[in-house]
Design a protein with these regions (language model features):
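Mobile cap/lid helix-loop segments that gate and shape the active-site cleft of serine hydrolases
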Residues: 38-83, 89, 102-112, 120-124
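Short glycine-enriched nucleophile-adjacent loop
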Residues: 20-31
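Alpha/beta-hydrolase-fold catalytic nucleophile elbow
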Residues: 14, 39-40, 95, 133
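Gly/Ser-rich "nucleophile elbow"/oxyanion-hole loop immediately N-terminal to the catalytic nucleophile
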Residues: 1-17, 33
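C-terminal catalytic histidine-bearing segment of alpha/beta-hydrolase fold enzymes
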Residues: 112-160
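Conserved strand-to-loop "acid loop" that flanks and positions the catalytic carboxylate
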Residues: 88-106, 133-136
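Flexible, active-site-proximal loop/turn residues at the rims of small-molecule/cofactor binding pockets
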Residues: 17, 42, 98
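Loop/turn elements at helix/coil->beta-strand transitions in domains of secreted/extracellular proteins
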Residues: 8-10, 31-35, 88-92, 126
Length: 160
């Protein structure tokens, strides 16, 4: 933002997998992020490996999930519904493949359906977009292109 070529009103973030959920966390904590794209980045905590949150809890990432909440999603004080809700009404594009073994698709839909109610309060339901390509843990080229168009549209950028 301190660089001349950065327009502080047109900052977006995009990430896949770990980068996908970190994009959502970034947006939740930094309102300068105006639009986000998450690819294969989350599912509901209860549906992440049948509720085993060990993958989230390693020492270099979120150790409190283990230390304080015993990797139990029922004890965790948040889920991705709340993360998505904090982003409203900002635009979020979600790539949630049908066969992602890491982030179960029905858990994504559970979170999105709940968060959509928050977006509705802002009359911004169209700002929460989900696609379900027929693939595994991947960000296929055609979905990437759709995500880039989403970013361009919401940041007001027209390719040259």
């Amino acid at each position: 933002q301190t660089m001349d070529e950065v327009d502080k009103d047109k900052i977006g973030a995009i990430g896949h997998s770990l980068g996908g959920h970190n994009t959502l966390f970034l947006g939740a904590f930094d309102e300068r992020i105006k639009v986000m794209v998450t690819s294969c980045g989350f599912t509901s905590m209860k549906k992440y490996y049948n509720g085993d949150l060990t993958g989230w809890s390693h020492k270099g990432y979120m150790p409190r999930i283990k230390e304080q909440y015993q990797c139990n999603p029922n004890l965790l004080p948040f889920d991705f519904t709340e993360i998505l809700g904090t982003l409203a009404p900002r635009p979020v594009f979600i790539n949630a493949p049908l066969h992602d073994n890491n982030f179960e698709v029905s858990g994504v839909d559970d979170c999105v359906n709940s968060a959509q109610k928050i977006y509705a309060l802002y009359k911004a339901e169209d700002n929460l977009k989900v696609v379900h390509p027929n693939c595994g843990h991947d960000f296929p080229p055609e979905i990437r292109e759709e995500a880039y168009r989403f970013l361009d549209k919401h940041l007001g950028w027209t390719p040259e």
